[in-house]
A protein has these predicted regions:
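Residues within well-ordered beta-strands of beta-sheet-rich folds
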Residues: 432, 488-490, 527-531, 591-599, ...
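Short, aromatic/His-centered strand-loop micro-motif at the edge of beta-sheets
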Residues: 636-659, 707
Length: 742
């Protein structure tokens, strides 16, 4: 059930941030190439059930599924403008409103459903498959042909299929079908078949041993690509995917069980001028849920996207593969770890790296999968991407079953930048910016405004994605010691610009601030001072620009902070639902030091600082952490074959500020509190190898020694620093003394 095809040259997505002092950046443009579809959801009529199928012709989008009515955008189910639509509705692609074509797909016994739609190459006939026995009262048998001009059933196309049809594709003379069936017009056909456009039998034979779920004709018409649950086609081993001859059905290319695991199936297939693309779904462990690109020339793999989260639909538009899924873990693609599901994604047809296009739905009804089908239709010089499924919200707004996006104009404004400004050394102010999020623009332009001026003093362009929002740092050296300055920042996609960020007011330092100066001198590559009073941003004061994110709204701007006499603030966590994590993924450090200050009276313990493999949810793998027991003792833990820990003899939940440093390197593990060594183990010099993120305030502690009641820390934390080396005892004592004495 394919739709519009369109090809253009792919462009490489820019990544990372630009440093201060670099050459003048190119300003961002709306829709970062090669993305050519906005993420702005347009007003669209909605269904009261699930949309499984789509096709388009001449500016009309046809939808099928399991539903009984449609209603305008913004109207709740049962509203005054709701109208009957029995498992089918046709819409104007440009307006999102229903057309006059109204068809009812019904069945005498059971639940009728439309699962596949395809349009003939001349745009005259719509083919519909599913499980139904009549269309507008005209008897049919799970397959029907509709004359589009008159919106009537073609009675000259009478094909009896004995079970559900789940996939359709059409040429000028042949209709191919896949599904659960075992016979077509009384003749044996297992799960795949073909008939003429007049409804007559053909010689095509491609018998699968399990249901067919997808099929697509190659652009030259020579082959048909089959997808489904099968392990064999015409007796030839080929799991879930096979290429067959379009005339005979003979297997042209098979795929062994190692290509797509036995736990996974193919749910959708699409093509362009050079490739074949599959959407895949798995069940159980060891599954493949992502997307595969095959070269059309030899049907061999071009790339594979191994994100987890069942892919239901794939669609190519201008050299970008768009997909509908509920992708929740793309860590194997070096992208985001297991977290909240993302339902709509984009990647180049030449490279599976995610592009900057992230409109979103929820899981919705039924199986809770979200989007199930996509189609692109053109009208009035604008292209529209329609999405159907079981979702009930789009971009956080109530919208059921259907939505659509367009090729322009782009109206979505980026999020307002989060900003922190500070001055630690005379002669400079550091302005730190957390890059913004724009659902269809990964590259944005940032402008810094000083002292209320209308003209920016600094401009740069940087890339960001929902799971990685790099910190930008600009150093203002045009300052006078003791003078006060204000800074505000905007983000722009070239068309839409945010309001200016809240004002950051800074007094330029007159003398070096002793504690942070020493932390930076000793080489910290993450240094969070928690001087922000609002938003979710944790600014990194180190040269690494490894900013972080607060989860759950911990209390910011808590005063006084840990460091005597400098007026800095801390952050307080509630011990149940709040933590912070670093934005950048890091390799496991070999030699390192973890440093922070804390204050608490908790009797439920919790993690203070640690390393873990996830961000917005509890990590599955954790170590290199300092946590507190219910009794207030501190434990430093490392995973080295098994969990290895060292523990203080004293308790530190006395409501006072304490300084803790944990180090590991060639001399083993050491744990210091308030400048003095409290525990050590010289034997443990290494740890398990994995990539992860630094967490503050809590993370998973399952399986660790003296596990406290809570994984999360109830108390205040300040001045967290990570070093890529082992701090010496004298350095640690110096830090403690500087912090206590100012």
């Amino acid at each position: 059930m394919r739709k519009l095809r369109s090809i253009s040259a792919a462009l490489t997505m820019a990544a990372g941030s630009l440093a201060a002092g670099a050459m003048a950046p190119q300003p961002a443009v709306a829709l970062t190439p090669p993305v050519a579809m906005t993420a702005d959801s347009l007003p669209t009529w909605q269904t009261n059930g699930i949309v499984f199928a789509m096709a388009q012709a001449n500016g009309t989008v046809f939808t099928g599924g399991t539903f009984s009515s449609v209603r305008p955008s913004g109207e709740a189910a049962g509203g005054p403008n709701e109208r009957e639509a029995v498992n089918f509705a046709a819409f104007d692609a440009a307006t999102g409103a229903p057309t006059d074509c109204r068809l009812s797909f019904t069945v005498g016994s059971g639940t009728a459903t439309v699962r596949a739609l395809a349009v003939s190459p001349d745009g005259a006939t719509l083919y519909a498959g599913g499980f139904f026995g009549a269309v507008n009262g005209t008897p049919v048998s799970s397959l029907a042909a509709i004359d589009i001009a008159t919106c009537t059933v073609r009675t000259d196309f009478a094909v009896a299929v004995n079970a559900t049809v789940r996939a359709l594709a059409a040429t000028a003379d042949t209709v191919y079908l896949g599904g659960d069936f075992s016979s077509v017009d009384g003749q044996p056909h297992d799960n795949f078949a073909a008939v003429t456009t007049s409804g007559d039998a053909t010689s095509f034979t491609a018998n699968g041993d399990a249901p067919g779920r997808a099929l697509e004709i190659t652009p030259d018409g020579a082959n048909v690509v089959l997808g489904g649950d099968f392990d064999r086609v015409n007796g030839t081993s080929s799991h879930a995917l096979a290429v067959v001859d379009a005339t005979t059905g003979a297997v042209v290319k098979g795929y062994g069980s190692s290509f797509i695991p036995s736990t996974s199936v193919v749910k959708d297939i699409t093509t362009d001028a050079t490739g074949v693309y599959t959407g895949n779904e798995g069940t159980g462990g060891g599954v493949f849920d992502g997307r595969i690109a095959l070269n059309l020339s030899d049907f061999n793999q071009r790339w594979r996207d191994t994100c987890l989260g069942a892919t239901q639909s794939v669609e190519v538009y201008k050299s970008v593969l768009y997909s509908g899924s509920h992708a929740h873990d793309c860590s194997t693609m070096n992208e985001y770890p297991n977290q909240r599901r993302k339902h709509l994604l984009a990647e180049s047809v030449d490279n599976p790296a995610k592009l900057g296009w992230f409109p979103d739905t929820n899981d919705g009804l039924g199986e809770g999968i979200g989007p199930r089908v996509m189609a692109v239709s053109s009208s009035g010089g604008t292209d529209y991407m329609w999405v159907g499924g079981e979702f009930t919200t789009v971009n956080g707004v109530a919208q059921q079953g259907l939505t659509r996006f367009s090729s322009g104009p782009d109206t979505g404004v980026p999020t307002t930048p989060n900003v922190n400004a500070s001055s630690v050394t005379p002669g400079s102010v550091k302005v730190r910016i957390q890059t913004s999020l724009d659902l269809d623009d990964s590259s944005l332009t940032y402008r810094v405004y000083k002292n209320g001026a209308a003209t920016p003093v600094y401009t740069t362009t940087a890339s960001s994605l929902p799971w990685v929002r790099p910190q930008l740092t600009w150093t203002d050296t045009d300052v006078t010691a003791g003078a006060t300055y204000t800074y505000r920042v905007t983000a722009s996609d070239g068309t839409n610009t945010t309001v200016k960020s809240p004002t950051q007011t800074v007094t330029a330092a007159t003398t070096p601030e002793a504690y942070p100066t020493q932390v930076l001198t000793d080489g910290a590559t993450l240094y969070w001072r928690y001087n922000e009073t609002a938003n979710t941003f944790v600014a990194d004061n180190s040269p690494a620009d490894d900013g972080g994110n607060h989860v759950g709204g911990p209390t910011r701007g808590v005063s006084p902070g840990a460091i005597a006499g400098n007026g800095s603030t801390a952050v307080t966590y509630n011990g149940t639902t709040q933590w912070s994590y670093s934005d950048a993924k890091r390799n496991r450090p070999n030699s390192y030091s973890i440093e922070t200050w804390f204050r608490t009276t908790t009797t439920t313990g919790g993690k203070i600082v640690g390393f873990g493999d996830r961000t917005t949810e509890a990590s599955a793998t954790t170590d290199k952490h300092v946590y507190m027991t219910n009794a207030g003792r501190l434990i430093f833990g490392v995973r080295s074959g098994s969990n290895r820990t060292i523990t203080t003899s004293g308790a530190y939940n006395d409501g006072e500020w304490h300084h803790v440093v944990a180090t590991q390197g060639s001399s083993g593990m050491r744990l210091y509190v308030d400048g003095s060594l409290q525990a050590s183990n010289f034997l443990i010099t290494g740890g398990n190898d994995y990539v992860g993120y630094w967490h503050v305030g809590g993370d998973n502690l399952s399986g660790w020694t003296s596990r406290p009641t809570s994984n999360y820390f109830a108390g205040s934390i300040d001045e967290t620093a990570i070093y890529p080396s082992v701090l010496s005892a004298s350095q640690i004592a110096q830090h403690y003394n500087l912090g206590k004495n100012g």
